[in-house]
């Protein structure tokens, strides 16, 4: 369980990405945004079919993905002041990890202490179940400007991949929340003709090796939203389990991305 490996600017499992600048006129499709409450009432929709909500962590951990379901949510209404924790931590750079010792040393009000207890408990139950949770403070992620026609940073819709069976767990406590999209409403970027043509220019090798090139460079992990796609905001305080692309997986991996942060706002989230 947990992340296998990441690039500094990627929030995905086991993803590695001097490619000359390629300038194209591709324009991103802006999906429609949905929240979790609207999904629960949209019976029969692709969003509702993708998500199952559970009532306990044990259910979240033990419930298998099946059919179209590749996102499980332990929906919670959290108490406490998480912004107090964020405001007490000096962030040197765009993001930093807050370890348990540093968290416990913070001098907090009653509301801040309530928030801290939730963070400590979430980290404990994840560790107890074999995960390696990381508590991150995020001002923003680094942008990938190496190849403008195909950015591979976390703001791009992508799936996680692992050589072993695993799931991705995450929860946002403060700031903008992560987003997912139903697989039926997204297309692999490597299948978009214009993008595929540009990738072939980058590859510049024998046709027989092109598909291996896409996999080895992890271009095949990234997706583009279809017209009128409905992006689902994961909300604050809810602990999520997302399906990962791994050998033996019985469902499609969950397509997700990091949100665009609001100026001056810092995200507080756990991921593993």
Language model segments and positions:
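A general structural signal for short secondary-structure junctions and capping/turn motifs
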Residues: 62-66, 125-127, 160-163, 170, ...
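N-terminal auxiliary "cap/dimerization" subdomain that precedes the catalytic jelly-roll/cupin core
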Residues: 2, 7, 12-130
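Short helix/loop capping segments that flank catalytic or ligand/cofactor-binding pockets
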Residues: 83, 180-182, 250-251
